[in-house]
A protein has these predicted regions:
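Cell wall/extracellular polymer interaction/catalysis modules
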Residues: 1-117, 124-143
Length: 143
């Protein structure tokens, strides 16, 4: 979870993981690094220009964007393997509220298991184990 723990008052940049129950969005993956098992979630390949806007001044705040962008954004295509598999957690999704927090994902953990900037991180083994059971109706509860 996030370095600042779990919060029901999540704000952009506070390093906390939002408290609540949320739907799951797209499964993003690095086709060059991961062979996907069967999965019922909608999928999208991460390309070199795939990003996620974390700049509340943008109309694309908390949405996938194409890089480069004049606004701040997380790059999803990384040297690190933490985003080889990621699922968008639908926090601050509909409607999007400026500065309430963005880019909350279920993704792979670092080897060191260090805290995230607000996401949920699990091992690749566990991610691949749960993936076949996830679908559009699946919810994640964070408490």
């Amino acid at each position: 979870i996030g370095k600042s723990g779990i919060s029901s008052l999540k704000k952009e940049g506070d390093l906390s993981t939002p408290k609540g129950t949320f739907g799951l969005g797209l499964l993003y993956y690095r086709k060059d690094r991961v062979k996907l098992p069967k999965c019922k979630l909608p999928k999208k390949i991460i390309k070199k220009n795939t990003g996620w806007c974390d700049d509340s001044r943008s109309k694309k705040y908390n949405r996938e964007i194409t890089l480069p962008s004049k606004f701040s954004a997380e790059k999803l295509y990384r040297k690190s393997k933490i985003y080889d598999l990621l699922i968008h957690i639908k926090y601050n999704h509909t409607p999007v509220i400026k500065k309430k927090g963005s880019a909350i994902f279920l993704h792979l953990t670092e080897k060191t298991n260090k805290p995230t900037k607000g996401c949920i991180a699990i091992s690749k083994k566990d991610f691949l184990k749960i993936l076949p059971s996830l679908n559009k109706k699946t919810k994640i509860s964070i408490s």
